Amino acid sequence: MAEPRRALAQMDDARISVGNARFLIIEAPYYEDIAAQLRAGAEAALTRAQARFDVVSVPGALEIPIALAIALDRAPALYQGAIALGCIIRGETYHFEIVANESARALTQLVVERKLPFGNGILTVETETQALERASVESGDKGGDAARAALALYRFSQEFGQVVEQAQIQAQRPVLTSGAR
């Protein structure tokens, strides 16, 4: 089996330091031990990047997009990014597909519409063993990966904003040309 690129896990957190930016972690601790590992990884990554963060819990993965929408509507300027954490383990019914697909769809739609730096740390797995391996800070660190994704997008938005400002300044300067031919 091919090994995934671990670029996010190997990213130097100091390189993506975000000063006082504030992030919202929304967790669905349906599986408490898995959620605790995801949260530990996310909090560690945010702390290393010198970000501030708040954590809220909701019952399940389907409630995460709704909670994020409420937070953004009630306090639109409070958060510069968000991280979703949770776990969906396949059972014997179609419910797995509904929860996995609809939570991902709703989150993607929301963060794209709002242009919000975001990291999705909602695991979708076949077994609890898979979930524990992926959530563990020592092995998979998917909570940390989700936080690093949000941090990287935040830095991108800041840096791209500076590029745009520089381009606008350049566009306003008069163009000097050499003499007429």
UniProtKB/Swiss-Prot annotation:
Q: Entry's CDD domains?
A: Lumazine_synthase-I (cd09209)
Top-level taxon of the source organism: Bacteria
Q: Which SUPFAM superfamilies match?
A: Lumazine synthase
Q: Which Pfam families match?
A: DMRL_synthase
A Gene Ontology biological process noted in the UniProt record is:
riboflavin biosynthetic process
Gene Ontology CC terms, in alphabetical order: cytosol; riboflavin synthase complex
- Recorded E.C. number(s)? 2.5.1.78
Known pathway = Cofactor biosynthesis; riboflavin biosynthesis; riboflavin from 2-hydroxy-3-oxobutyl phosphate and 5-amino-6-(D-ribitylamino)uracil: step 1/2
Keywords attached to this entry: Riboflavin biosynthesis, Transferase
Which residues participate in 5-amino-6-(D-ribitylamino)uracil binding? Y30, A61, L62, E63, C87, I88, I89, N120
Alphabetized InterPro entries for the sequence? LS, LS/RS, LS/RS_sf
Cite a single GO MF annotation. Answer: 6,7-dimethyl-8-ribityllumazine synthase activity
| Positions contributing to (2S)-2-hydroxy-3-oxobutyl phosphate binding | E92, T93, R134
List of catalytic residues: H95 (proton donor)
This chain belongs to the protein called 6,7-dimethyl-8-ribityllumazine synthase
Q: In which organism is this protein found?
A: Beijerinckia indica subsp. indica (strain ATCC 9039 / DSM 1715 / NCIMB 8712)
Top-down, what is the taxonomic lineage of the species of origin? Bacteria, Pseudomonadati, Pseudomonadota, Alphaproteobacteria, Hyphomicrobiales
Q: Which gene carries the instructions for this protein?
A: ribH
